[in-house]
């Protein structure tokens, strides 16, 4: 497949025109024209780039790419090294941020719901879905399910919250700012990747279970699902490479 064809396929599948994002979605760094071997990962870190070079990839597809708003525009240091790796090895870099969070089947939020066996009911607002467990789950058991499925420890604040969780909202990655909207909507619990100092106070005062399960850990599954879809639909050789990150 040509690199520009792959961009069109991904742009259409993820409906990128519906989003105002913090970084460009699509082909961010152009490499060789023809693509057969693709590496997917959460973030276009140097470690992922090096793994893609070792894998002889034609393209890298990530959730966290480059050229974020307000980042320095000069090419030096870390940015130079990353771009040099891509350009020296003629590797294409594709990045999809909010469109990959939001996709109703392949997105990070959809995939986390699938992993946790949550029945999705709708959205409180854009990027903030809610749903229910068929059978209410003890709040501690939910933390244990998260830890088992994600393979990491999970912070749980349930000081004044319901002991059982039926209705739940979630936002993968750095979605802790949505906790108040979720609590006001009337959920028993809210899951995201990160925690801020004020998040715990809000959880306590609004009597909602809060879980911080890791930015990286909660966002592994969208990019993995997108790569699997590409492999199935277009017969590309796609490999997901997980670069461990405790954050």
Curated annotation (Swiss-Prot):
Assigned GO CC terms: cytoplasm
Record's keyword terms, sorted: Metal-binding
Residues involved in a divalent metal cation 2 binding: 64, 215, 219
Metal-binding found in the keyword field: yes
Residues that hold a divalent metal cation 1 according to the record: 63, 101, 219
Stored InterPro entries: DUF34/NIF3, DUF34/NIF3_sf
Domain of life: Bacteria
GO molecular function: metal ion binding
Record-stated family: Belongs to the GTP cyclohydrolase I type 2/NIF3 family.
Subunit organization: Homohexamer.
Name recorded for this polypeptide: GTP cyclohydrolase 1 type 2 homolog
């Amino acid at each position: 497949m040509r690199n520009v064809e792959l961009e069109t396929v991904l742009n259409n599948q993820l409906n990128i025109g519906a989003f105002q994002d913090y970084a460009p979605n699509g082909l961010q760094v152009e490499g060789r024209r023809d693509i057969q071997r693709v590496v997917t990962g959460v973030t276009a870190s140097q470690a992922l780039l090096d793994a893609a070079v070792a894998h002889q990839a034609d393209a890298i597809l990530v959730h966290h790419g480059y050229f974020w708003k307000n980042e320095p525009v000069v090419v030096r240091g870390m940015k130079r090294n990353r771009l040099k790796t891509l350009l020296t090895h003629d590797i294409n870099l594709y990045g999809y941020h909010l469109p990959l969070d939001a996709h109703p089947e392949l997105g990070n939020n959809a995939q986390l719901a699938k992993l946790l066996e949550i029945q999705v009911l709708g959205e409180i607002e854009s990027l903030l879905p809610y749903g229910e467990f068929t059978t209410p789950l003890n709040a501690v058991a939910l933390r244990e399910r998260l830890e088992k499925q994600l393979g990491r420890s999970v912070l749980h604040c349930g000081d004044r919250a319901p002991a059982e969780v039926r209705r739940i909202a979630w936002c993968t990655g750095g979605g802790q700012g949505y906790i108040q909207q979720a609590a006001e909507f009337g959920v028993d619990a809210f899951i995201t990747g990160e925690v801020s100092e004020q998040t715990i106070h809000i959880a306590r005062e609004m009597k909602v279970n809060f879980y911080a399960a890791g930015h990286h850990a909660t966002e592994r599954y969208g990019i993995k699902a997108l790569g699997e879809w590409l492999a199935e639909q277009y017969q590309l050789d796609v490999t997901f490479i997980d670069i461990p990150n405790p954050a």
